[in-house]
Amino acid sequence: MPLLNSLATPYAEALLQVTEARGESQTVADQCKQLLEIWDSSADFRNAMVSPVLEPDAKKMALQALVGEQVTPSMLNLLKVLADRQRLLAFDAVMLRYLELYREQQGITLAEVRSAQTLTEDQQAALSKKVQAMAGTNMVDIDLSVDPSLIGGFVVSLGSQVIDASLAGQVRRLGLALAKAS
């Protein structure tokens, strides 16, 4: 992904500069997350946007129709520039890089949380408080994902620190302890 990162960085930096000047960087960060969810969940949309068969103007019209009313003009302009320059292949890299630069600028720590099942609102709130305490700051952005292979519990990645409170992790550690003992 280094090549995509080097391609994505100028676009992400430009978007951050524009949104910072307009006071909408938080709004655009939220929009990046929403657009990434759409991008990841719809293979048809993704395939159409990266297809060399579709003309840039058709892609821009589709983007305008799909998200034009729900995103800031800055975000819409970026999407149109990516379409014009045939760079929609790097769409997710641009969004992720923007989020990374935004967090860095705002002093926000990213916590990646994988749970065995979807968490309720109350569980998310409790987990958020615990992660904030672990990070030592209230400025924590939590990226939740579901990983059924964990069997139960969750795994929190906070920078280089990993807290494995999953059933699969406990079974693995028990197996290692038994192997060591014999």
Curated annotation (Swiss-Prot):
Its main location: membrane. It is found in: Cellular thylakoid membrane. It is a peripheral membrane protein. GO terms for cellular component: plasma membrane-derived thylakoid membrane; proton-transporting ATP synthase complex. InterPro entries: ATP_synth_OSCP/delta_N_sf (IPR026015), ATPase_OSCP/dsu (IPR000711). It comes from the Bacteria. Keywords: ATP synthesis, CF(1), Hydrogen ion transport, Ion transport, Membrane, Thylakoid, Transport. GO terms for molecular function: proton-transporting ATP synthase activity, rotational mechanism. Belongs to the ATPase delta chain family. F(1)F(0) ATP synthase produces ATP from ADP in the presence of a proton or sodium gradient. F-type ATPases consist of two structural domains, F(1) containing the extramembraneous catalytic core and F(0) containing the membrane proton channel, linked together by a central stalk and a peripheral stalk. During catalysis, ATP synthesis in the catalytic domain of F(1) is coupled via a rotary mechanism of the central stalk subunits to proton translocation. This protein is part of the stalk that links CF(0) to CF(1). It either transmits conformational changes from CF(0) to CF(1) or is implicated in proton conduction. F-type ATPases have 2 components, F(1) - the catalytic core - and F(0) - the membrane proton channel. F(1) has five subunits: alpha(3), beta(3), gamma(1), delta(1), epsilon(1). CF(0) has four main subunits: a(1), b(1), b'(1) and c(10-14). The alpha and beta chains form an alternating ring which encloses part of the gamma chain. F(1) is attached to F(0) by a central stalk formed by the gamma and epsilon chains, while a peripheral stalk is formed by the delta, b and b' chains. This is ATP synthase subunit delta. It comes from Parasynechococcus marenigrum (strain WH8102).
